[in-house]
Amino acid sequence: MAPPGSSAVFLLALTITASTQALTPTHYLTKHDVERLKASLDRPFTSLESAFYSIVGLNSLGAQVPDVKKACAFIKSNLDPSNVDSLFYAAQSSQVLSGCEISVSNETRDLLLAAVSEDSSVAQIYHAVAALSGFGLPLASHEALGALTARLSKEETVLATVQALHTASHLSQQADLRNIVEEIEDLVARLDELGGVYLQFEEGLELTALFVAATYKLMDHVGTEPSIKEDQVIQLMNTIFSKKNFESLSEAFSVASAAAALSQNRYHVPVVVVPEGSASDTQEQAILRLQVSSVLSQPLAQAAVKLEHAKSVASRATVLQKMPFSLVGDVFELNFKNVKLPSGYYDFSVRVEGDNRYIANTVELRVKISTEVGITNVDLSTVDKDQSIAPKTTRVTYPAKAKGTFIADSHQNFALFFQLVDVNTGAELTPHQTFVRLHNQKTGQEVVFVAEPDNKNVYKFELDTSERKIEFDSASGTYTLYLIIGDATLKNPILWNVADVVIKFPEEEAPSTVLSQNLFTPKQEIQHLFREPEKRPPTVVSNTFTALILSPLLLLFALWIRIGANVSNFTFAPSTVIFHLGHAAMLGLMYVYWTQLNMFQTLKYLAVLGTVTFLAGNRMLAQQAVKRTAH
């Protein structure tokens, strides 16, 4: 139990900014996510490309490969000096490894310079320029820019444009990079918005992350703020960090590069504000603790955090304003214990200052102030209906049960009066859930009523048997009266056995048998009546019909016996035998269709038998025709 004068604070949810209506980051990299991303990048090298993704990706997160010398040796042993891509991966990887120097021959330098041409793809130009920059070799930026611009006009894909941004960041600041910088605005226009929360290219998350990394790298290089709105930066951030598990190294590398760019650039640094700890961490003191960090969960210790205002959700009245947070370790704290706020919900508007690069730096937190409820002035009364007898009142103190029983019948009503107060402040409370439950001790029947406060916040429940007989099914008996108090802001919800009440309904209205209100009792079995089968015809009729059906076959056999069957032309040629067997098989199939198969199955088998029988019959008739012609 909290001591008097204190309240409990529960942090519920981070909502959108109230003052600026700017978007709030919904996805970012927690410390656990950062470690998981590092694990995705820290894989055994399988190629120079995979080494590049691992080494440079880890460096973006402020880490490095476990064995720098081994990584450097791998790069040198796998370097192909005649391949521009290989040189790019080696140059960029060795650049972030301390003490890893790679010597380059004149032939290799000439190869890279030759690749910076209009005839090369944008990807080749990017790799060549970045390799020359990584190896510290001289480069004519104006010529490279001309080749890049000419080639980019032929390759208008998003990937080529992003690679052009990366390329420009390696060129001299003296070069006129305005045309390349203007491509950023065109790329932003090609982004797709999803639900007002996400912004991405249709090519997917990886290219979106590479675009963010390339944009801020180039803008830091030329010293110009990118043409991206703050809301768009947050939408891009939500897209990039929405995925937590990565199957490919390239995707993990792109996310790491974007995270580094968003946490370390000269123009836009998104701020992530999250409550510190769970609700139980702050039960005994009114302290709001916040973690303020970058997208990589790096604490922004240099930030200044202050409360703009706090408003009651119910009344919208301002209860706090212009209060600074204090930095305790890596956590910002606001102690408002002395204010003694009533229990309820409050919207805290918090602003993070200290750097003009901060965006999404005004957030609104929904805070719940909890307290303990106390029950006072509990009176149980029996009131005569014609008021000829003075009411009998008994006062009960929570959590004791009233002694004796109370009677409610056709002559007197039963009434319950009580008040609810805040244990900490003494203020009156009106919780959302205040119920009176009456439980029949014999049948288990339960009836629940809502207790309503009057204009003085005194709760009253009155039981008039003539008005409440429908709720009770006119079931007389002894009922246990429970008082139920509950609310989301209460630390001590109450279920109190207050008293036993004998309720008597007029006997002429009472049912002969009181049924339990248990909804789970077995229901009466339903007896189904099926339609009687139709009478079948006599057996004589069925036999007569069968004989009539078979009579043509019997007549055929009789005529064959009488005049003889002409089988002189029957041959045992394969076509003749197959034809007759096929014909017999089709007759047999008709029988099987009648007894077992459906129409579609029968048609499938009939198609096979019919085809074979047709071909055999055609062959048989052709042979008979040849015989007749010969004779």
From Swiss-Prot:
Q: Which domain of life is it from?
A: Eukaryota
Which pairs are disulfide-linked? none
GO biological process: one example: protein N-linked glycosylation
A cellular component term from Gene Ontology for this protein is:
oligosaccharyltransferase complex A
- Location in chain, cross-link Glycyl lysine isopeptide (Lys-Gly) (interchain with G-Cter in ubiquitin): 154
Glycan-carrying positions: 106
Chief subcellular location: endoplasmic reticulum
Q: Which UniProt keywords apply?
A: Endoplasmic reticulum, Glycoprotein, Isopeptide bond, Membrane, Signal, Transmembrane, Transmembrane helix, Ubl conjugation
Q: Record's family?
A: Belongs to the SWP1 family.
Q: Summarize the subunit comment.
A: Component of the oligosaccharyltransferase (OST) complex. OST exists in two different complex forms which contain common core subunits RPN1, RPN2, OST48, OST4, DAD1 and TMEM258, either STT3A or STT3B as catalytic subunits, and form-specific accessory subunits. STT3A complex assembly occurs through the formation of 3 subcomplexes. Subcomplex 1 contains RPN1 and TMEM258, subcomplex 2 contains the STT3A-specific subunits STT3A, DC2/OSTC, and KCP2 as well as the core subunit OST4, and subcomplex 3 contains RPN2, DAD1, and OST48.
Name this protein carries in UniProt:
Dolichyl-diphosphooligosaccharide--protein glycosyltransferase subunit 2
